Amino acid sequence: MNAQPRSALALAARYAVPFGLLLIPIWMTQVNSVVPEPYLDEAFHIPQAQAYWSHQWTQWDPKITTPPGLYLFSYAVCALILLLRGSPEHLDPPALRATNAAAAAVLLPLRLQTALDTVRKQRNTRPSGAWLSHTVLNICLFPPLFFFSGLYYTDVLALLVVIEAYNWDLSRGRPNAVKLETAVFLVLGVLALLFRQTNIFWVSVFFGGLQVVRRLRRVTKNCESTNVADILAAGSRNELYDPLVLDASLVDYVKTAASLCSVALNNLGSVITSLVPYLIILATFGGFVLWNGSVVMGHKEFHTASLHIAQMLYIWPYFVFFSWPLLLVPMANIVLPKFMLPKFLNQGFPASRRRLPSLLTVLIILPIMLAVVHFNTIVHPFTLADNRHYVFYVFRILLNSHPYTRYVATLVYFLGAWMIISAMGYSPVTAAPGLASVVRTQAPPASATSAEERTEKTQKLERKQKGFKKSAQVASSAPAPIDPKVLADLQEHIRRRQRLEHETSRVSFVLVWLAATALSLISAPLVEPRYLIIPWVMWRLHLPPSPTPVIYRRASDEKDLEARIAVNFPLFLETVWFLLVNVITGTLFLRGGFEWPQEPGKVQRFLW
């Protein structure tokens, strides 16, 4: 990622990445041209922002359920522009949409790049004109995110402030971190709650959980045992059981959770100290809920909290639909026998990692999914009452095509979950290196000396008599034996660095991500693709980069371009797929309008 491109084509591609972000203002311009008036939720957001612009701070539309962060951001941006340019004096829909598009095209990519470089522990050495990576461009082109970047919705800014808080939280973990970084993180964590209430689960649970895991990794060794009792006992010795995702079975997730709890109890003071900033943010949110009487702001009767576990089933086909280009190569390496795997796709994974879900996993997870579908399929009245949303058509197929369709869909949920979680651990990381060989400190027994060795000794003695001083100097330069204890300490240091550098490939990260995702989704009765933007972005940020195929790992200069194409093919395929989806959904929105019989003359439009 940081290497300088070796070909003109690679250099051109690198500089072309930022220009891809111009699609965002182009999309917004098209929306303004065809839909100049507020559409759908904009009918609530835009008048509220205009009220704030008129300094009517106490006016609030009860149909709005999210906090006022979006309107405050637009007020600050437009006030600054007014100060510099003398306009705009009135905030019309295009002006407000422009503040959202600017955040999506300028601020969000820059902060995403910082987060990506930090997560992957890489320095950004790209030249200024090519500062953004292909991965960041693809995240910004993610269809639900891209679509709402041209409208006046809360999604872009809700994501932006979470990413910015994450950057500061990651900077707190550096050895030279200062109290200022913690203070800034606290401010950003609270600000994140002003844009969307469910951000609390990302700035407190997700960030806090990862911080605890990082803290525990610094003070622990690997637990070599796989026995549950031994794993729990090993916690008192600061040994953590946390395997790589591709080496883990379903039982390993339970063992890792138990090991984390055991080690955390053994380091309780350190864990509590590391959680203080997140607990402060959580307490602030709790104070808001007590003051407001509810989590939502406006019409509470339409947005009451409920236990909607089925949300954690819908997420998997959603991820697979958008990210299948990134899953093709991993799935080929895992599923296909080695003799059937094309050489340009073979990334050298051992046979132990080329396996399907175990029968035990199937027998445990599938019945749970079936039970969730049977007892917890919640259909919000808005879902089947509004045919402008794509979710309307998905649920109509699930519920109305056949009584057993929703149960058969559990196979899709299961396979999707397996693919998405497996991709999280799809990394070339192997087991920790073995101990270095110890230099002998004793000579071999005399009986073991061969005739050749005796002849060699005689020759050395003659050379010694001829040039004693020179031989003495050579002998004095021989390396001294290394203490085995030093070698053991060195190996443990390597293992610890490996755990820290590849934390996203381990079971502990998946557990924390799943917990934050579940908490942010299962309390919402309404199924909205927009609600899954932050879970997807966090998954995408932490997705390990694709390893180089074995055939190209020692490629000659003539094959260098071919190797780069092979490595980056999933990224290019992802770009093409996102552009195709954006063109289709954008065209449907702009050109595929229709009318409702109950509202003649008013154009209805398809959207996420």
UniProtKB/Swiss-Prot annotation:
Topology within the bilayer: Multi-pass membrane protein
Any GO molecular function: dolichyl pyrophosphate Glc2Man9GlcNAc2 alpha-1,2-glucosyltransferase activity
Keyword match Transmembrane: yes
Pfam name, any one: DIE2_ALG10
Basic and acidic residues bias spans: 451-465
Annotated keywords: Endoplasmic reticulum, Glycoprotein, Glycosyltransferase, Membrane, Transferase, Transmembrane, Transmembrane helix
Location(s) in or outside the cell: Endoplasmic reticulum membrane
The protein's annotated pathway: Protein modification; protein glycosylation
Transmembrane segments: 8-28, 64-84, 143-163, 183-203, 271-291, 312-332, 359-379, 407-427, 507-527, 569-589
Chief location category: endoplasmic reticulum
Gene Ontology biological-process entries: dolichol-linked oligosaccharide biosynthetic process; protein N-linked glycosylation
Matches recorded under InterPro entries: Alg10
Region of interest called Disordered, as start-end residue ranges on this chain: 446-466
Role: Dol-P-Glc:Glc(2)Man(9)GlcNAc(2)-PP-Dol alpha-1,2-glucosyltransferase that operates in the biosynthetic pathway of dolichol-linked oligosaccharides, the glycan precursors employed in protein asparagine (N)-glycosylation. The assembly of dolichol-linked oligosaccharides begins on the cytosolic side of the endoplasmic reticulum membrane and finishes in its lumen. The sequential addition of sugars to dolichol pyrophosphate produces dolichol-linked oligosaccharides containing fourteen sugars, including two GlcNAcs, nine mannoses and three glucoses.
Family note: Belongs to the ALG10 glucosyltransferase family.
Name the record gives this protein: Dol-P-Glc:Glc(2)Man(9)GlcNAc(2)-PP-Dol alpha-1,2-glucosyltransferase
Organism: Emericella nidulans (strain FGSC A4 / ATCC 38163 / CBS 112.46 / NRRL 194 / M139) (Aspergillus nidulans)
Gene: alg10
